[in-house]
Amino acid sequence: MSQLKLEEISSVIEEKIKNFELDCDMAEVGKVVSYADGVAKVYGLNGVMSYEVLEFETGDKGVAANLEEDSVGVIVFGFGNNIKEGTSVKRTKSLMKVPVGDAVVGRVLNALGEPIDGKGEIETNEFSLIEQKAPGIMDRKSVHEPLQTGIKAIDALVPIGRGQRELIIGDKQTGKTTVAIDAIINQKGQNVICIYVAIGQKESTVAQVVRKLEEYGAMEYSVVINASASDSAAMQYLAPYSGVAMGEYFRDHARHALIIYDDLSKHAVAYREISLILRRPPGREAFPGDVFYIHSRLLERAAKLCDEKGAGSLTALPIVETQAGDVSAYIPTNIISITDGQIFLETDLFYSGIRPAINVGLSVSRVGGAAQIKATKQVSGTLRLDLAQYRELQAFTQFASDLDEASKKQLERGQRMVEVLKQAPYSPLPIEKQVVIIYAGAKGFLDSVSVKKVVDFEEQLHPFLEAKYPQVLEEIHTKKALDKDLEAMLRKVLEEFKLTYSE
């Protein structure tokens, strides 16, 4: 029998001790003191960070919103039906993150970045914090590239540039979402990733939007984030921040993105609900004092970055719903003061058949003019003024019947320009075609066409140009300006078309 050597035994024991790992998991755990309306009061989590993700033993998750002396107010993501007094809560020591990158494109997600379209998991290793600091002044560049929506009234009168924040505001059922969807459809082939964030919308409405995007082939460069009316207030509050985190990824990787928040009125209401349950003091219209800050920190993240940072951009089109056209309410005035202009949609215009129902007088773009192409500037330079004078004359003619010849002519021209700016939904127009039809209206080529036939004139003009003079459209597209030769050619083409056009 071989004897065991003492050295061997000691070396084996030493080896075992050296490689011994204590398999124990340290966790900071607290207990739920009370739970109601999607908010849990948790005791015993002293080292928790603001907006840190916390896990409940029931499998629910939430974020620490209120950090008090002896307890933490936690917003629960779902409805937390199984959470009750005594439920244990664990720290994750991480802030809220969502998946980003090309893996999310073409998908429908919830506010947490989880897929809800039945197309399987999102396969990505890239995640981003939903709360990020907005780029500073030195990291930005002034807006100078156009972001065309394909809507004549917007691209000519309220132009939007890449990196701009342009508010779409109006009563319900005035076509706000349609304007935003048109803008997404028009980004096809422009290398712009589009993110549509639905906040507090009906599930059926969101399904319709997704169907429209799929129908026009826009879903292949879009992401839809849905926090519907049936979701909790916490999900509705988080959705825009998840969306902007996904948009920032493309902005920071020298690419371009467009984000639509539909709509921020419902976002403010969701935040008000959470704040009141957290017992925060209410202010005007029962909104908490920091309701301005939740929107300003969200919209400031849309920017055009400087060349050193890759020259990427994130453009934001927030939507706000007004009550009976009241733009002086609390949330509308807040967001008007944050954004770089607004597109105001009016119920009266909508029902009188002027669609998109854009009130040109109240709509403005504070920085987009610098991004407008020269050709559009040339043809629509006096358009806003002409339309304002037409509206003034129109109001005057309701009382006075006899008008001088010049006023009559102005009235006739104005009526035709209003018709020119009409556009069917989901049919965005390339900028070169917009230039042609606005030029035709502004230079009097439509004066002999009856007002009712202006839309028909336009519908026939575009196929005529594409078939016989595609080089005219091509030149406008490449030159981005109307020089003397191109203008002369355009006049010749329009005169020729007028001869062939029959009403």
From Swiss-Prot:
Binding sites annotated in the UniProt record for ATP: G170, D171, K172, Q173, T174, G175, K176, T177
Swiss-Prot/TrEMBL site (Required for activity) positions: S363
Recorded topology in the membrane: Peripheral membrane protein
Domain of life: Bacteria
Functional summary from the UniProt entry: Produces ATP from ADP in the presence of a proton gradient across the membrane. The alpha chain is a regulatory subunit.
PANTHER family: ATP SYNTHASE SUBUNIT ALPHA, MITOCHONDRIAL
Protein's recorded name: ATP synthase subunit alpha
